[in-house]
Amino acid sequence: MTRAACIVLAAAVLAGCSANNTPRTLYTWGSYEDLIYATYASPGKMPPEQQVEMLEKDYQQARAANRRMPPGWHAHLGYLYYQLGRTDQARQELLTEKAEFPESGVFMDRLLANLERPEPSRQ
């Protein structure tokens, strides 16, 4: 091999190594992980409305990129909808979680059953 060919080959190898080769993950996490951490680290600091807004924005970005949301994402959004009194949307998110992650079916069924029950009156 000539010296010029070796230089060209080395340049091609280095160019290939420097390309953005980060692996594509199975799910789009968006701000979900940070949001969950913030919710548990400082309860009550971030209102459900703000969390819903962040998650809905992440969902729109994921749909635009044809990506999936991670396990628990739809269930968490459903819980937030429930906190806001939007039970129809909560039900839909819990059903979506159950459909996308069948292993969560028993838990989602329990949450859906609780969604149907009226809250006990507080006195």
Question: Language-model segments: which ranges?
Answer:
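Flexible helix-coil transition and linker loops at the boundaries of alpha-helical arrays
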Residues: 21-25, 58-68
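TPR/TPR-like alpha-solenoid helical repeat scaffolds
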Residues: 33, 37, 41-42, 105-122
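Structural register within alpha-helical repeat arrays
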Residues: 76-77
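TPR/TPR-like (Sel1-like) alpha-helical repeat modules
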Residues: 87-102
